[in-house]
């Protein structure tokens, strides 16, 4: 990450033209989850739901920007497992260079504010870092 004085953190809706970039970030994200999933690098496949984020009005994909740099993504949908009529964080990824500086917490707050109401957020039971992050964000 380039050093910037308090760069703005924002969400930018991803478009169909952004699909290759988002697909690459999803691949990076899935690679980072391998130690928690029990899968191998060979098991990483294309994120099968990605095309739906450009056609289904119940799904929204955002790039996370720190200044003008892409720092990750958040995928939001209404396909919840427990809470009907709610939104879900389907996937949430902050690139390593942007972690530990409050970016994730700010993005979570912006995302929740953009879609008021009930939310569902799930993590892998073995991913203690994710569990701690979401507990600190949600309180």
Predicted regions and their residues:
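Conserved acetyl-CoA-binding loop of GNAT-fold acetyltransferases
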Residues: 112, 135-139
């Amino acid at each position: 990450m380039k050093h910037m004085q308090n760069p703005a953190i924002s969400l930018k809706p991803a478009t169909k033209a952004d699909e290759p970039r988002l697909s690459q970030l999803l691949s990076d994200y899935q690679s980072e989850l391998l130690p928690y999933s029990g899968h191998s690098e060979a098991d990483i496949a294309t994120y099968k739901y990605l095309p739906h984020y450009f056609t289904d009005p119940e799904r929204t994909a955002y790039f996370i920007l720190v200044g003008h740099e892409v720092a990750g993504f958040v995928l939001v949908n209404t396909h919840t497992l427990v809470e009907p009529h709610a939104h879900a964080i389907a996937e949430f990824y902050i690139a390593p260079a942007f972690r530990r500086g409050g970016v994730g917490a700010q993005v979570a707050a912006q995302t929740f504010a953009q879609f008021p109401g009930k939310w569902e957020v799930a993590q892998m039971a073995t991913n203690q870092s994710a569990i701690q992050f979401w507990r600190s964000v949600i309180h």
